[in-house]
A protein has these predicted regions:
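Alpha-helical membrane segments of multi-pass proteins
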Residues: 2-8, 20-316
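Bacterial N-terminal signal peptides
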Residues: 11-17
Length: 316
C-alpha cells in the first residue's frame, strides 16, 4: 500500500512540475526581455527545463550513491528520461517553437512530439523515483503521510486507470482542435499555455496508465485496446483535417505564404502528420505490447506444461 501511494504521489509531483515547463514557455508570448532578442518566455522555459533535469539527476545520483549504479533506477530508465527531456527541450525551445507560430503543420509537429515522444520517454524514465529521492528525508516522510491517505489513493487509482486516462486524453485532443479554441491559443498566451499543459499533462497520464498496464499480462490486453482506440480516434481527426476543403484555423490565414503553402495546404499537412506518423506510433506501441503479452502467455503455458509433466513423473 505504502509503495503504491509513494509512487503515485511522486508521479503527480513530477507531472505538475513538468506541466509548469509546458506552461512557462507561453508566459509572455510576445515580450522581449532585457537579454536582447531572446523572449522572456524562452528564458522561463529554459529555467523550468533545467530545474526538472536537476531534480531528476539529484534524485538519480543520490539513489545510486546509496544502492549502487543501476540499482533502484536502471541506466536504461535514466537514458529514457534524458531522451524525453531532450525532445521536450527541442519542442519548446528553438526553431520549431518559432515556426509553430506561423504554420499549423509545425504546431502540430510540436504537439505530437510532446504527446508521442517526450511523454512516454519521460514516464519510462520513472521520474517518480528520482523525484522522491531528490527530496530531503523529512519531506519524503511528509509526502508519504499525505499519500497514505486511502481517499487520495482511491482517487489516484481511478484517474490513472487505463479507461479514464484514455477518455481524459481523448477529450483534451478533440476539445483543443475546435477552431474557436485553437485560434485562441495564438491570440492569448494564457490559453496557449493551457493547451500545451493539457496535451502534455494528459499524455503523461495516458502513457503512465498504458506502461503500468504492460507490467501485468492480463492488463496488457486492455492497454493494447486503448492504444489502438487512440490511434483510431486521433487518426479520424487527422483525416478530417487532411480531406477538408475548408480552412478551420483562420489564425494561420496570413502566415503560410512565406513558406510556399496556402493555409489549406498547411492545414492538410498538419492533419496528415496527426493521421499517419502519429498513428504509426500508437499502432507500433500496441503491437509491441501485444507481442510481449503473447510471449508471456507462451512462457506461462510452457511453465504449466513442465509442472504437469513433473507431477505426472512424481506419481509414477
Amino acid at each position: 500500500m505504502r509503495k503504491v501511494a509513494v509512487r503515485s504521489s511522486a508521479l503527480i509531483a513530477m507531472l505538475i512540475f513538468l506541466l509548469g515547463i509546458a506552461t512557462a514557455h507561453e508566459g509572455n508570448e510576445h515580450a522581449t526581455s532585457v537579454f536582447g532578442d531572446l523572449e522572456f518566455s524562452q528564458i522561463l522555459t529554459s529555467i523550468g527545463l533545467l530545474i526538472s533535469l536537476a531534480v531528476y539527476l539529484t534524485g538519480l545520483f543520490r539513489l545510486w550513491r546509496i544502492a549502487g549504479r543501476g540499482h533502484g533506477l536502471g541506466v536504461a530508465a535514466a537514458a529514457s528520461f534524458l531522451a524525453g527531456w531532450l525532445s521536450l527541450t527541442g519542442a519548446l525551445i528553438g526553431p520549431l517553437h518559432d515556426l509553430s507560430e506561423s504554420l499549423f503543420s509545425a504546431h502540430m509537429t510540436q504537439h505530437e512530439i510532446l504527446m508521442l515522444v517526450s511523454a512516454p520517454l519521460i514516464i519510462l524514465g520513472r521520474p517518480q523515483i528520482a523525484a522522491v529521492w531528490s527530496l530531503p528525508v523529512r519531506w519524503r516522510k511528509n509526502v508519504s503521510v499525505v499519500t497514505n491517505n486511502q481517499n487520495f489513493e482511491h482517487i489516484w487509482q481511478f484517474v490513472s486507470g487505463s479507461f479514464v486516462a484514455f477518455l481524459i486524453h481523448a477529450a483534451a485532443l478533440w476539445t483543443w482542435h475546435i477552431p474557436m479554441l485553437f485560434d485562441a491559443t495564438l491570440e492569448n498566451a494564457w490559453v496557449h499555455a493551457l493547451q500545451h499543459a493539457s496535451f502534455f499533462g494528459t499524455a503523461l497520464l495516458f502513457w503512465w496508465a498504458i506502461i503500468n498496464a504492460s507490467l501485468d499480462w492480463k492488463s496488457s490486453f486492455v492497454g493494447v485496446l486503448f492504444l489502438f482506440l487512440t490511434s483510431l480516434h486521433s487518426g479520424i481527426l487527422g483525416a478530417f483535417l487532411t480531406f477538408t476543403r475548408e480552412i478551420w484555423y483562420s489564425v494561420y490565414a496570413n502566415s503560410t505564404a512565406a513558406y510556399g503553402l496556402t493555409p489549406l495546404e498547411d492545414q492538410q499537412l498538419g492533419g496528415l502528420i496527426m493521421w499517419v506518423p502519429a498513428g504509426l506510433v500508437y499502432i507500433g506501441a500496441g503491437l509491441a505490447m501485444f507481442a510481449r503479452v503473447l510471449s508471456q502467455t507462451e512462457r506461462r503455458a510452457l511453465d504449466i506444461d513442465r509442472r504437469l509433466q513433473a507431477a505426472e513423473t512424481a506419481n509414477l
